[in-house]
């Protein structure tokens, strides 16, 4: 049997050999992983733990909160606020940032997270997950504000997600490739099961909510119509559609075997650039996808180059296999040029 490498050992070796991970960042990632284990226990208990169903409240996005959304958010805050690695946290479930209380030491990092992505799938037992992103606090001034969080995704120090499915799997990057860890329930440790994950440049799978076809912009309609035309169409090959409705599950499949994930702008809410959150979902997933050799764009710009104007900013998302993402971007460019923009 090959030697099993735990998450802790992997991070320590990265710190020693490559200098990629400062000690504070390593400890922060370990705390996030421990919090994910606690969330996994609550998710796995399901109805037995009386954690399913709606909490009867809405988050800042105007979405009905599930009980597990609130539990997961509290787990992440409680686990991370006292360790001395963080200055503040921001969550999709909270209106404003959570500054580390004065009674605890403050660190140089800021943690952003979607505590339970895909939570609309909780009650039907479909894979859901936690997405997280780590930024460094810029400057040495005392205190931290919302403005400190407004950095392009290219400045992320680390990003990852934990998917709660048939296995509990942690997928992580610190800017040196993508590593996958599987939770060994017997020992309680995350164990390295894949390193240097790579997304194939070409694919025959796409992930999109096709029921919104009539609301899309012309370049998105063109791309999907060509995929659906299959072998007889301009692409000359058949495509499969996969859509779970949980970003973690859909992107995990794409990281594992290729594909393109699409959550575009649509005309039902024309003033909103998209539905997914730039800081909590798009940036960390874009970092992972790019580190795995893929690409991530909003149709006009690389996602990790976007300068956020506010904490809960939304964005169109097209990410995955590089050649397909480039094709979608090309269709958007051609449409803009034809329209004279």
UniProtKB/Swiss-Prot annotation:
Subunit structure: Homotetramer.
Catalytic activity entry: beta-D-fructose 1,6-bisphosphate + H2O = beta-D-fructose 6-phosphate + phosphate
Keyword Secreted listed: no
Gene Ontology terms: biological process: fructose 1,6-bisphosphate metabolic process; fructose 6-phosphate metabolic process; fructose metabolic process; gluconeogenesis; sucrose biosynthetic process
Domain of life: Bacteria
Positions bound to substrate: 117-120, 209, 275
Cofactor(s) this protein requires: Mg(2+)
Protein residues bound to Mg(2+) 2: 114, 117, 281
Binding of Mg(2+) 1, residues: 92, 114, 116
Molecular function terms, GO-annotated: fructose 1,6-bisphosphate 1-phosphatase activity; magnesium ion binding
InterPro entries hit by this protein: FBPase_C_dom, FBPase_class-1, FBPase_N, FBPtase
Subcellular location: Cytoplasm
Name under which the protein is recorded: Fructose-1,6-bisphosphatase class 1 1
SUPFAM superfamilies: Carbohydrate phosphatase
Gene name in the database record: fbp1
EC number: 3.1.3.11
Cofactor note: Binds 2 magnesium ions per subunit.
Main localization of the protein described in the UniProt heading: cytoplasm
Family: Belongs to the FBPase class 1 family.
CDD domains: FBPase (cd00354)
Organism expressing this protein natively: Leptothrix cholodnii (strain ATCC 51168 / LMG 8142 / SP-6) (Leptothrix discophora (strain SP-6))
Residues in the signal sequence: none
Pathway involvement of the protein, from the record: Carbohydrate biosynthesis; gluconeogenesis
């Amino acid at each position: 049997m090959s030697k099993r490498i735990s998450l802790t050992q992997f991070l320590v070796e990265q710190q020693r050999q490559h200098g990629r991970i400062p000690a504070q960042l390593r400890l922060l990632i370990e705390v996030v992983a421990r919090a994910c284990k606690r969330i996994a226990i609550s998710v796995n208990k399901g109805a037995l733990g009386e954690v399913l169903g709606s909490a009867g409240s809405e988050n800042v996005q105007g979405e009905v909160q599930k009980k597990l959304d609130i539990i997961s958010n509290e787990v992440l805050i409680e686990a991370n606020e006292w360790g001395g690695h963080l200055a503040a946290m921001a969550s999709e479930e909270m209106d404003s940032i959570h500054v580390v209380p004065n009674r605890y030491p403050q660190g140089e990092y800021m943690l952003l997270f979607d505590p339970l992505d895909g939570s609309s799938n909780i009650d039907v037992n479909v894979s859901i997950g936690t997405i997280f992103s780590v930024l460094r606090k810029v400057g040495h001034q005392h205190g931290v504000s919302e403005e400190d969080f407004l950095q392009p995704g290219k400045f992320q120090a680390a990003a990852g997600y934990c998917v709660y499915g048939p296995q509990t799997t942690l997928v992580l990057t610190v800017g040196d490739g993508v590593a996958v860890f599987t939770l060994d329930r017997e020992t309680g440790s995350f164990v390295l099961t894949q390193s240097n994950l790579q997304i194939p440049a070409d694919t025959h799978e796409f992930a999109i909510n096709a029921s919104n076809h009539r609301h899309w912009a012309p370049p998105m309609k063109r791309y999907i119509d060509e995929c659906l035309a299959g072998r007889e169409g301009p692409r000359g090959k058949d495509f499969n559609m996969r859509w779970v409705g949980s970003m973690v599950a859909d992107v995990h499949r794409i990281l594992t075997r290729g594909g393109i994930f699409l959550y575009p702008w649509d005309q039902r809410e024309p003033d909103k650039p998209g539905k997914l959150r730039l800081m909590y979902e798009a940036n960390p997933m874009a970092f992972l996808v790019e580190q795995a050799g893929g690409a991530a764009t909003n149709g006009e710009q690389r996602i990790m180059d976007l300068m956020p104007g506010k904490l809960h900013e939304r964005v169109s998302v097209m990410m995955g296999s590089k050649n397909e993402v480039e094709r979608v971007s090309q269709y958007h460019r051609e449409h803009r040029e034809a329209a004279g923009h």
